[in-house]
């Protein structure tokens, strides 16, 4: 009985053991599954954190690259702007220098023409004065010749007085009636001489008066001509001074126009920059827009024109 019973119990025990072992196996498997399932969220969290960190790193790197590119682009734009402004200033200076040279050439031509006119006038005046001087010399020479002629005439008069009709009549009277005395004879001769000399002197003075009248008329003409030349010289001097004043005024107006033009250019450049900044803010908020150098290169020449 006991053996039979023990034989019957052994399979049951083994079955129980198998069931127990199976249950224990299931339990350990479930535990392992649960452990595995409990570990998966941690791994996911770690992966998410890692992904977020990588994302932040990428974003930071992208922001750094973006800032570097923006700085580089800004520096390039500023350099290009300065280069274009320098070129524009150089062109403006060249144009102004060309204009000044043209005006200087024009003024030089005008001054040379005025100088030529003055030289011509001076030459004419010099020739006129030379002619006047020569005329005066000739007049003096004529006067000397006239005095020589007068001396010869006086000598001739003396001779004629001695041979005059009065003298001859007086000598015949003396021969016919005798001499009235030495004293009266000398007085009468002196009187005859004085009468003849006075008559000749009256004729000479009349001739001299006519000559002086002609000389005075010629001197009046020369004085009038001299006054006319002097007035012309004064007018030329005044005109030259006016030309100098006009030249100074034109230079001052040119400098003022240049300063006004530069102010307008600076104001226009400032307005263009403000316009671009407002456009950047309107498109991208506070972040400056990255625009190409080509577009700025096309806009900047418009600003400096």
Swiss-Prot record:
Its main location: cytoplasm. GO terms for cellular component: cytoplasm; midbody; spindle midzone. InterPro entries: MTUS1/CCDC69. It comes from the Eukaryota. A lipid is attached at residue 2 (N-myristoyl glycine). Residues 42-167, 216-278 form a coiled coil. It is found in: Cytoplasm, Cytoskeleton, Spindle; Midbody. One of its GO terms (biological process) is spindle midzone assembly. Keywords: Coiled coil, Cytoplasm, Cytoskeleton, Lipoprotein, Myristate. Residues 13-41 are annotated as: Disordered. May act as a scaffold to regulate the recruitment and assembly of spindle midzone components. Belongs to the CCDC69 family. This is Coiled-coil domain-containing protein 69.
């Amino acid at each position: 009985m006991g053996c039979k019973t023990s034989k019957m119990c052994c399979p049951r025990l083994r079955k129980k053991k198998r069931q127990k072992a199976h249950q224990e196996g299931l339990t350990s498997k479930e535990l392992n599954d649960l452990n595995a399932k409990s570990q998966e969220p941690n791994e996911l969290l770690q992966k998410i954190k890692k992904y977020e960190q990588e994302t932040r790193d990428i974003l930071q790197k992208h922001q750094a690259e973006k800032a570097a590119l923006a700085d580089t682009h800004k520096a390039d734009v500023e350099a290009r702007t300065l280069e274009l402004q320098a070129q524009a200033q150089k062109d403006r200076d060249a144009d102004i220098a060309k204009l000044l040279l043209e005006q200087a050439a024009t003024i030089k031509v005008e001054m040379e023409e005025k100088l030529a006119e003055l030289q011509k006038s001076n030459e004419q005046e010099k020739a006129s004065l030379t002619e006047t001087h020569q005329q005066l010399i000739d007049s003096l020479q004529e006067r000397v010749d006239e005095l020589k002629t007068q001396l010869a005439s006086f000598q001739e008069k003396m001779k004629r007085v001695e041979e005059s009709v009065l003298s001859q009549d007086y000598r015949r009277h003396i021969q016919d009636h005798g001499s009235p005395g030495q004293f009266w004879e000398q007085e009468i001769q002196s009187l005859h001489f004085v009468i003849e000399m006075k008559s000749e002197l009256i004729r000479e003075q009349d001739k001299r008066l006519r000559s002086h009248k002609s000389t005075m008329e010629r001197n009046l003409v020369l004085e009038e001509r001299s006054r006319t030349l002097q007035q012309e010289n004064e007018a030329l001097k005044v005109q030259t001074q006016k030309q100098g004043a006009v030249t100074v005024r034109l230079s001052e107006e040119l400098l003022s126009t240049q300063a006004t033009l530069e102010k307008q250019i600076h104001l226009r450049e400032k307005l263009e920059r403000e316009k671009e900044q407002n456009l950047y803010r309107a498109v991208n908020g506070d972040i400056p827009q990255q625009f190409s150098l080509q577009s700025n290169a096309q806009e900047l020449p418009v600003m400096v024109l």
